[in-house]
From Swiss-Prot:
Segments of skewed composition (Pro residues): 223-235
The species this protein was found in: Danio rerio
Superkingdom of the source species: Eukaryota
Compositionally biased region (Low complexity): 236-246
Disordered: annotated segments: 136-160, 172-314
Protein name stated in the entry: Uncharacterized protein C1orf198 homolog
Biased composition (Polar residues): 263-276, 284-294, 304-314
Length: 330
């Protein structure tokens, strides 16, 4: 830029004026007209223009662009005015129209009536200087109002909350005995009880954890008694519809499920009822044969029922599911 400035200073004056004319004329049409008027004024002064000072050149341009009669008219109406500190405000009285509504005696004043204004009367009368008068700061000598009359006494919940917060902050400073409060601890603090230290709470928690596994075996399900050995096989002679029941000998180590299946296999009433339902020979059977069959079945049932250990099994067709047997056979 320094080189360009030096090159511009080295150019002759007529080249500099030509560049100025070209630049300002290329801005817009108004600038081009102004530059043309300026060139006409320069031509009227001729060679004396280059000898004039910049102030004299500006005065000559102003006098050439504005008619002297117009300048004299403005000079006649020139009045010395006081300087206005703030922006001048148009003092008009708007909203002077009174509106009457129909036949009823309803009247109101139209705030936006003639003379019209976008602002209402209250908006036009508003001033910031009035606000400073309204908000006068109180003097230092004035006594302060009593806070006891204006302040509301804190409720019990708020007071307890602040007590708990103060207690917690104090304990946090003292190595933070409890990092977090549970609802039960908050209730105990509200009642005035002191919470247990952290090491005591840890021990009590560990004791509870130790007590839980000890008490669990007592709650476990009682083991089912082993299945009793089946009675010796008793041959039963029945009609073709009846079937002789011969229970299988027990295994060396009988399990609970095998004992239950074995006990059900020794129930002759179930097998007899099944045959009675599905055998076609029962349709022509006489009542005497049925009575003798029932007596034989009752004798067979009486022999296993005599043992005390076998009495826990139900020999009826509807097996009662009680206790843990219900869970095993669900």
């Amino acid at each position: 830029m320094a080189a360009a400035a030096m090159a511009g200073a080295a150019d002759p004056p007529h080249l500099t004026e030509a560049k100025k004319l070209e630049y300002f004329s290329s801005i817009n049409s108004m600038a081009r007209k102004i530059m043309q008027e300026r060139e006409k004024i320069k031509e009227t002064y001729g060679s004396a223009w280059s000898q004039m000072s910049p102030v004299e050149q500006d005065t000559a341009i102003d006098n050439g662009m504005m008619d002297p009669r117009i300048r004299a008219r403005y000079a006649m109406h020139r009045v010395d005015r006081d300087e206005v500190i703030c922006y001048p405000k148009l003092l008009i009285q708007t909203g002077q129209k009174i509106v009457h509504f129909g036949e009823e005696d309803l009247t109101w004043q139209d705030e936006h009536s003639a003379p019209f204004s976008w602002e209402t009367k209250s908006q036009m009368d508003f001033s910031i200087s009035n606000m400073t008068e309204l908000f006068v700061p109180p003097s230092v000598n004035e006594p302060k109002p009593k806070t006891s009359q204006t302040t509301k006494p804190p409720s019990n919940d708020e007071s307890s909350f602040w007590k708990i917060s103060a207690e917690r902050s104090r304990l946090d400073n003292e190595k933070a005995e409890f990092p977090s409060l549970t609802p039960s601890q908050i209730k105990s603090l509200e009642k005035g009880e002191k919470p247990l230290p952290s090491y005591l709470r840890l021990e009590s928690g560990s004791r509870d954890m130790e007590e839980v596994p000890v008490s669990r075996p007592a709650k476990q399900r009682a083991p089912k008694p082993p299945a009793p050995p089946p009675p010796p096989p008793v041959p039963i002679s029945m009609t073709p519809a009846a079937i002789s029941v011969t229970p299988t000998p027990p295994a060396p180590v009988p399990s609970l499920e095998e004992g239950w299946e074995r006990a059900q296999s020794t129930l002759p009433s179930v097998s007899s009822t099944t045959d009675e339902v599905f055998s076609p020979g029962l349709v022509t059977r006489s009542s005497s044969q049925s009575n003798s069959t029932v007596k034989d079945v009752e004798k067979a049932e009486a022999s296993p029922a005599s043992s005390p250990t076998f009495s826990q099994f139900n020999t009826s067709s509807s097996i009662l599911k009680t206790g843990f047997d219900f869970l095993d056979n669900w």
